[in-house]
């Protein structure tokens, strides 16, 4: 995968995690604490991975960080599933979109 494609994907992921953070804030107390923590962590990791990609072309390190980001995305998606129908649909959609974008990048990198 070309570095410019990785950077484009990471920009999309960061945008998706921005939307998830906004949805968590909008949901307020409806958002479970574990989901809130996962979304915050996913957002921070997405920003860190994007910065790493801009600074370095070390593919192995970048792949490892994307793998970690996907694990965080998995936890966020699972937290949404545990919350069930009580969760704001916009929040659930934002988390799923971020998770899917991360998963797609991981598949392309492996």
Describe every region a protein language model picked out.
Residues 9-20, 41-48, 68, 72-75, ...:
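Amphipathic, well-ordered alpha-helical segments in soluble domains
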Residues 6, 10-13, 35, 39-42, ...:
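Hydrophobic packing residues in well-ordered alpha-helices of helical domains and bundles
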Residues 3, 29-33, 59, 84-88, ...:
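Short, structured coil/loop segments at alpha-helix boundaries
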Residues 2-37:
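Short terminal alpha-helical segments
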Residues 77-110:
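Amphipathic alpha-helical binding modules
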Residues 13, 20-23, 27, 49, ...:
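Alpha-helical solenoid scaffolds that mediate protein-protein interactions
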Residues 24-70:
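Amphipathic alpha-helical interaction modules
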């Amino acid at each position: 995968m070309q570095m410019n494609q990785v950077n484009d994907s990471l920009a999309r992921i960061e945008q998706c995690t921005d939307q998830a953070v906004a949805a968590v804030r909008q949901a307020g107390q409806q958002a479970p604490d574990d989901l809130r923590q996962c979304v915050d962590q996913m957002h921070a990791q997405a920003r860190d991975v994007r910065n790493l990609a801009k600074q370095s072309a070390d593919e192995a390190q970048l792949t490892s960080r994307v793998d970690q980001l996907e694990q965080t995305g998995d936890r966020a998606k699972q937290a949404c599933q545990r919350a069930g129908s009580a969760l704001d649909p916009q929040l659930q959609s934002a988390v799923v979109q971020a998770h899917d974008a991360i998963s797609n990048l991981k598949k392309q990198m492996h």
